[in-house]
Amino acid sequence: MPRRVLQGQVISAKSDKTIIVSVERRFKHPMYHKTVKIAKKYAVHDPDNLYNQGDKVKIIESRPISKTKCWRVIEDKGQ
């Protein structure tokens, strides 16, 4: 099974070796035909504490690192 790759923005970098990334998803509501925007937060492994709040990053699914972390940062997309 291929690993999922998502793109999002760092909303918290307060924890050691962990960042919280918000990933936005847009879709058209089937009944109301309006574009709906949904955001989901992921705990992401950042071993070198390189990323700060507001950075755009690309994340990939990985093996479980802790109870809530199963994503890693693979690329920095700039600010």
From Swiss-Prot:
Gene3D superfamilies per record: Nucleic acid-binding proteins
UniProt GO BP: translation
Keywords from the UniProt entry: Ribonucleoprotein, Ribosomal protein, RNA-binding, rRNA-binding
Disulfide bridge map: none
Ranges in a coiled coil: none
SUPFAM superfamilies assigned: Nucleic acid-binding proteins
Gene Ontology CC annotation, any one: cytosolic small ribosomal subunit
Gene Ontology molecular function terms on file: rRNA binding; structural constituent of ribosome
Pfam families the UniProt entry points to: Ribosomal_S17
Domain of life according to the entry: Bacteria
Assembly, per entry: Part of the 30S ribosomal subunit.
Function: One of the primary rRNA binding proteins, it binds specifically to the 5'-end of 16S ribosomal RNA.
Entry similarity comment: Belongs to the universal ribosomal protein uS17 family.
Alphabetized NCBIfam families for the sequence: PRK05610.1, uS17_bact
HAMAP family noted in UniProt: Ribosomal_uS17_B
Protein name from the UniProt record: Small ribosomal subunit protein uS17
Originating organism: Orientia tsutsugamushi (strain Boryong) (Rickettsia tsutsugamushi)
Species classification: Bacteria, Pseudomonadati, Pseudomonadota, Alphaproteobacteria, Rickettsiales
